[in-house]
């Protein structure tokens, strides 16, 4: 009986988080760099809060007052969420670090872990039914490239993984056909 109650509680919490994400994505008041990065930082902190993975955030006190389209926010959020999920699912990490910066006209979000890593030089299969096909990495890359950015993955077996999302701010205001 207690397992069922815990399961219902976990499911309810997941539904509430999903609803919060939907409301955030569709609210036009959040169409700024400052709102987006603040939300992403808080989301990362909350995401790891009950997991045993220590999470450090490196976020500037203030971000430039730059608009972001809702599509860009949505794709950026889903890519970052996938990177965080990969840390929990695959890395066996005890520590994560999320860094957010605006440099050289770009938004840069770096998600690092101290987990087991993988051979990032190994070819990625295109077989979507294969368990080792790196669907999450492919999805993150597609989401970010669809909004004009790039996703850089660096990983070494035994040393962890770093995923860097780079988004030119000049394209971040445009609605994109995806």
Tell where the protein language model's regions lie, with residue ranges.
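Coiled-coil dimerization/phosphotransfer module
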Residues: 1-178
């Amino acid at each position: 009986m207690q397992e069922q109650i815990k399961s219902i509680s976990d499911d309810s919490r997941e539904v509430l988080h999903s609803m919060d994400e939907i409301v955030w994505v569709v609210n036009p008041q959040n169409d700024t760099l400052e709102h987006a990065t603040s939300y992403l930082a808080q989301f990362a902190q909350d995401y790891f809060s009950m997991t045993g993975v220590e999470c450090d955030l490196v976020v500037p006190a203030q971000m430039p007052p730059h608009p972001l389209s809702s599509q860009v926010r949505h794709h950026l959020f889903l890519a970052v969420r996938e990177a965080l999920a990969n840390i929990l699912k695959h890395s066996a990490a005890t520590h994560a670090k999320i860094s957010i910066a605006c440099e050289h006209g770009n938004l840069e979000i770096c998600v690092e872990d101290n987990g087991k890593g993988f051979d990032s030089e190994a070819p990625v299969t295109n077989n979507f039914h294969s368990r080792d096909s790196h669907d999450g990495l492919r999805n993150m890359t597609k989401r970010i490239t669809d909004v004009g950015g790039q996703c850089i993955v660096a990983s070494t077996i035994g040393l962890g993984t770093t995923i860097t999302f780079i988004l030119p701010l000049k394209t971040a205001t445009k609605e994109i056909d995806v």
